[in-house]
Amino acid sequence: MILLFKEETFAQEFRELLGFVDADINFKSVKSDLTSATREMIDFVGKPTYDRWVTLFEKENRSAAENDQLLLMRYPIAMNTYRLVAPSKDLQHTNQGRMLRTDDQQARPFEWMIERNNEANERKYYRAVDQLLDFLFDDTNFKQTIQYKTIRKYFVCTTADFEEYFPIHSRLLLMKLSP
């Protein structure tokens, strides 16, 4: 599987995409989580749709519109990768067991702060996937995929249909609720 990130430029691109990460996150240390996040995205959008983004990613001279389109796929993958990585980065795993990472300039956040941050990151991820799905549901190429046709076969197949009875405001949630 081809990832939408290059090892050589990963740390800088990851920081720029997320905007709140100030560390140089090593590609090799997150590659398995990046792969998991990518596979999860492929499950949502399908391999042919993901492959279109790979082609766009590998393109040499992209237009501004193409860069915006690429961001729609890369941001949720990066956000999900961070959600998977962050909890294990809070602790140092040593021969003596798990240890707290500290230094003179930083203070350890309270548990409730970490939980709120994790919840906020999860909401960011869900919003990003919903934005991608909104884009895809208007895309003629996506309308030809198995993923789109599977969703359309249900009696309640859009968020508008579902929201007549219960407000969810999320295509991702609707997809997860589908049988």
Predicted regions and their residues:
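Conserved short "hinge" loops at termini or chain/domain junctions
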Residues: 1-74, 88-179
